[in-house]
């Protein structure tokens, strides 16, 4: 049986294992996440649960309808965000993901939505590198399961398991530094280089 699932912000277990999910609204009130038909067919329930779990860390989006679509696994793109500069605020936001993508990629794409809809309010600048920095600060350390793609260096990626806690702390510091200096990304990357020494 397929049924609609409703959520409350404080729900600890958002989805029961025995519930088959579809593209119905997975909601906070009347808003929340909807899976497209292709995503619903190609994503496992476990992956859908992870997307919903990550969505909890983006409360600014809970009053929006967010569509989650599917990207073919053959392509190079792990995730994408569909943003039209002239899109109406009443239109649903949309991200697309490859099946079973990492938590960090999911958070990165949700952060792009914040860049689009809450840029002024949250002071999140546009761009992929800024998106990586802000995404690092959104998730608890234990949910960060992959390194950022647009910032850092080879040694950071190679030693990710041992440096991710420090890199996340540097991301918080970089956001603070940005309040007074424009070169916060350069500062962040210089500090990451020092971790390899």
Identify the function of each model-found stretch:
Residues 141-197:
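Long, well-structured alpha-helical subdomains associated
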Residues 1-34:
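N-terminal low-structure segments adjacent to metalloprotease catalytic domains
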Residues 42-62:
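Zn2+-dependent metallopeptidase catalytic core
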Residues 110-130, 134-143:
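Catalytic Zn2+-binding segment of zinc metalloproteases
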Residues 36-47, 125-128:
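A short, highly charged nucleic-acid-interacting micro-segment common to nuclease
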Residues 102, 110-114, 180:
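Ampiphathic alpha-helical segments that act as solvent-exposed interaction surfaces
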Residues 60-92:
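Catalytic zinc-binding patch centered on the HExxH motif and its immediate surroundings
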Residues 91-106, 121-126:
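Short pre-active-site segment immediately N-terminal to the catalytic Zn-binding motif
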């Amino acid at each position: 049986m397929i049924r609609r699932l409703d959520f409350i912000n404080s729900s600890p277990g958002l989805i029961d294992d025995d519930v088959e999910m579809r593209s119905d609204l997975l909601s906070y009130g009347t808003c929340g996440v909807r899976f497209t038909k292709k995503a619903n067919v190609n994503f496992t329930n476990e992956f859908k649960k992870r997307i919903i779990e990550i969505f909890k860390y983006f409360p600014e989006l809970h009053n929006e309808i967010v569509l989650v679509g599917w990207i073919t696994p053959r392509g190079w793109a792990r995730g994408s965000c569909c943003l039209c500069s002239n899109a109406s605020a009443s239109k649903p936001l949309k991200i697309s993901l490859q099946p079973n993508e990492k938590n960090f990629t999911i958070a990165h794409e949700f952060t792009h939505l914040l860049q689009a809809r809450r840029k002024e309010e949250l002071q999140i600048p546009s761009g992929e590198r800024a998106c990586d920095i802000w995404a690092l600060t959104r998730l608890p350390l234990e949910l960060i399961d992959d390194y950022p793609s647009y910032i850092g260096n080879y040694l950071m990626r190679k030693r990710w398991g041992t440096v991710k806690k420090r890199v996340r702390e540097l991301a918080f510091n970089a956001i603070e530094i940005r309040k007074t200096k424009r070169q916060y990304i350069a500062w962040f990357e210089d500090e990451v280089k020092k971790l390899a020494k």
